[in-house]
UniProtKB/Swiss-Prot annotation:
NCBIfam families named among the record's database cross-references: PRK11784.1-3 (NF008751), tRNA_sel_U_synt (TIGR03167)
Family the UniProt entry places it in: Belongs to the SelU family.
InterPro entries recorded: P-loop_NTPase (IPR027417), Rhodanese-like_dom (IPR001763), Rhodanese-like_dom_sf (IPR036873), SelU (IPR017582)
Keywords annotated in UniProt: Selenium, Transferase
Entries under PANTHER family matching the protein: TRNA 2-SELENOURIDINE SYNTHASE (PTHR30401:SF0)
Residue ranges of domain Rhodanese in the record: 12-136
Catalysis: reaction(s): 5-methylaminomethyl-2-thiouridine(34) in tRNA + selenophosphate + (2E)-geranyl diphosphate + H2O + H(+) = 5-methylaminomethyl-2-selenouridine(34) in tRNA + (2E)-thiogeraniol + phosphate + diphosphate; 5-methylaminomethyl-2-thiouridine(34) in tRNA + (2E)-geranyl diphosphate = 5-methylaminomethyl-S-(2E)-geranyl-thiouridine(34) in tRNA + diphosphate; 5-methylaminomethyl-S-(2E)-geranyl-thiouridine(34) in tRNA + selenophosphate + H(+) = 5-methylaminomethyl-2-(Se-phospho)selenouridine(34) in tRNA + (2E)-thiogeraniol; 5-methylaminomethyl-2-(Se-phospho)selenouridine(34) in tRNA + H2O = 5-methylaminomethyl-2-selenouridine(34) in tRNA + phosphate
E.C. number: 2.9.1.3
Native organism: Pseudomonas paraeruginosa (strain DSM 24068 / PA7)
Protein name, as recorded: tRNA 2-selenouridine synthase
UniProt KW Transferase keyword: yes
One record GO biological process: tRNA wobble uridine modification
Amino acid sequence: MRDNTQHYRELFLEDTPLMDVRAPVEYHKGAFPHTVNRPLMNDIERQKVGTSYKQHGQQAAIALGHELVCGAVKAERLAAWKAFAEANPNGYLYCFRGGLRSQIVQQWLKQDAGIDYPRVIGGYKALRNFLFETTRAAVDECDFVLVGGLTGCGKTEVIAALDNSLDLEGHANHRGSSFGRRATPQPAQIDFENRLAIDILKKRHRGVGQFVLEDEGRIVGSCSLPLELYQGMQGYPLVWLEDGFEQRVARILKDYVIDLRSEFERVVGAEEGFAVFSAYLQKSLAGIVKRLGGERYQRLAAILVQALEEQGRDGSVETHRGWIEGLLKEYYDPMYAFQRQSKEDRVEFRGNQAEVIAYLRQRQALRPS
C-alpha cells in the first residue's frame, strides 16, 4: 500500500490525479486543476450533518452521516470512488483537512472494495496553503518585469512567446478590458489563484527566476490578482511595447470581432452564438457610457449596430473598424497616456514586438544564477 502523503510540491509538479471528497458546494468554491469531485456527502447531507455537529456534537453527527449515506446511496458513491482509484492508481484522495471524511472513504474502499487508497494529509487546506506560500515566496525571491503598451499592441502575443511569462489573462480566462469576456466562464477566484501558483511552481522548478507579466490592474474581469503580487507590480520595471495604429485596429478586429464571434458560436451554436456575441459587444460598450459621455457613446453605438447588422447579413467586418478606431482615439489611448505618466520612470526599454521579445529573452539570460 502507498503511504498517505504530505509531498504537496510533487503532487502539483506531477499533476497527480486527486479525488476531492468534499461536498459539491465546497468544490465549486475552489479546487485544483487535476482534481475530480467524488463527494462523500452531497450539499444537503453535509448541511444536515453540520447542523447536527453544532447542536449535538461529533458522535451524533457521525451517526447521522452513516444514516444518510447508506444502502444504494453508499453503493453508488463507492462505485464512483472505486472507478477513480482503478483509473488512477497513482492518485490520492482528500477532504477539507484530511480528517474524518477522507478517512471514512479510505475505510469504505478498503472494507467494501478491497482497495487501499492513500489520502493527502492536511487535505484541501494544506494544499491551498502550500500554493499561497508558493506565490508569496516568488514575489519575495524572484525578479519581475512588466509588459505595457496601448490597447491592441499585442502584449498577449509577447507573453505567449516567452517561456518565463505568467499569463494572468489566460489564467483568468478574460482579456482584462471592458470588452475582455470570453465565451466560457471565468474560474472561481480560488481556482484562478491556484492555477497561477501552480504555473509559478512549475516554472521555478525549471529554473525560472525572472517572470514577465502583462501590466494589469488589480482586477482581471472578476478575478483579483493576489494582493502581494499586485503590490509588487506597482514598482516593477516596465517594458513598453509599441505598434502602429492600423496594426492595433486590425489586431482588435481579429481578437474581439472575428475570433470572439467564432468562440461564442463554438460554445452555443451558430445562430444563438452570433446573437449572444452581438449582445455582448453592445453591453460592453454601454458599460463605459459614463466614461465616454452620452454623445460619443451614441455615435459609437450606432456604428456598432450597423457593423453587427452587416456582419450578420454577409459576414463583412469592415464597418467594425469605425467604432474600434473611435474607442482607441477617444477613450483608450488618452487613458493610457494619462496612466503612463506615473510609470514613466520605470520604463527601461521601448520597442516593437520583435525587439521587446528579444530584449526580454536577453534580460532573462543575463540574470545571475
